Amino acid sequence: MAFRTPAVQLHLKACVLLLLGGLLEAAYQERGTMYMWIDANQARILIGFEEDILIVSEGKMAPFTHDFRKAQQRMPAIPVNIHHVNFTWQATDQAEYFYEFQTLRSLDKDIMDDPTVNVPLLGSVPHKASVVQVGFPCRGDQDGVAAFEVTILVMDAGGNIILRTPHNAIFFKTCQRAKCPGGCRNGGYCNERQVCECQDGFYGVHCEKALCSPRCLNGGLCMSPGVCICPPGYFGSSCERANCSTTCLNGGTCFHPGKCICAVSFEGVRCELSKCRQPCRNGGKCTGRNKCKCSKGYHGDLCSKAVCEPSCGAHGTCVEPNRCQCREGWHGRHCNKRFRGGVSNSQRVSPSKHKSPSVAAAKEAPETSQPSETNYVV
C-alpha cells in the first residue's frame, strides 16, 4: 500500500466529509436529538484510517457543511472502486424526525443509473441506530464521469425543516467499462462488478436462460419469456397437452403421445375395454376389475340381487327393491301372513298402487285359468 502523508489523509477525510455532509444543511433544532455518523469500518474503506466520523450531533451539522457551495468546487469524483456510501442515523429518546428523499437522479444515464437508497423514499428516522446506503450504479457500458443529484429533507414532528440538502447539489462518480467473460445476452449488460444484469424474463450467468411461468412441461424448452418450444408429440402454451394419433375412448385422457389415462372402469390402449367382463346390472357402475358399485336397492357381484328391508322372511323372495314374491299359501308385504280356508292367492290379493306386470296379468286372467303360483305383494 502506498504511503500517505498526514496532509494527504486530512485532504481525503475532508473530501469524504464534504461528500456526505453535503447531503444535508444545518438548521436550528429546539428540542429532541438526532445523530448521523460514518462508522469506523466505512471510514477505513473510504479514507484509509479507522475512526468514527460525526456528521450530525445533537441536531447540529459539522461546521464544514455550512459553506457547501465553495467546498463543492473542490470535491473530487467518487473513485471507481467505491460503489456505495453508508451512513448511520438515529433519533434518540422520544424525538420524532421525518425524512424524504426528494431527488435521486443521474444526469448522465448512459454512464450511471439513478442513485439508489436502501430505505423507503419517505419515512421517519428510526429510534434504533440504522444504516442508510446510497448506491452509485455505474452501467459499465463506457468509461467516464457521471454527474448526479441527491436531495433529502428532514423535518421534526411539527413540520419544521431541520435538515435539507442544498438545491442543485451536484456530485460526481467515476465509472469504467466493465468486461464480463462470455458476454451478456438477450439485452443484458455487464455492470462495473463484471456481472451480467439481465432484462426481465431472463437469468443465468450470461442472461442466456429465459423464464417461463408456468414452466415448460414434458421436456419443453423455454426460448423467451412465456414462450415454450415443445418436443414432438406435445403442444400447448406450456407443452402440457399430448398429441395422440388415436382418440382415447370412454372418458380417457391423452397424457403422452399414443398413451391414454383411462377412467376408473376402463382399460386398454384407447380405454376401449371395460374392467368388468360382465356388465353391472340395475344401474350399477364398474369401479375396478370385475367390481361393481351398485345403485341403491341392489347388491351382489353384478348388482343383480334386490334388497328388501325388512327381509321377505322364509316364505318369500326379494325380486325388486322392497318388493317380495311370496310362496303359495302366503301373502303380505313381507310374506308373513298365511291364507286360510284354502283360498287361492289370486282371490286374496289386495290392490296395490305399484302393481308389477305379473300382478296385472293375474288379475286380468280368465276365471277358468289356473291361479299363479307366485305373487308380488305390496
From Swiss-Prot:
Domain WIF, chain residue ranges per copy: 36-175
Glycosylation sites: 86, 243
GO MF entry, a single one: signaling receptor binding
Tissue-by-tissue expression: Highly expressed in unsegmented paraxial mesoderm.
SMART domains the UniProt entry points to: EGF, WIF
Repeat as UniProt keyword: yes
Subcellular localization, as worded in the UniProt entry: Secreted
GO CC list: cell surface; extracellular region
Sorted UniProt keywords: Developmental protein, Disulfide bond, EGF-like domain, Glycoprotein, Repeat, Secreted, Signal, Wnt signaling pathway
Pfam family, one: WIF
Protein name as it appears in the record: Wnt inhibitory factor 1
Species whose genome carries this gene: Danio rerio
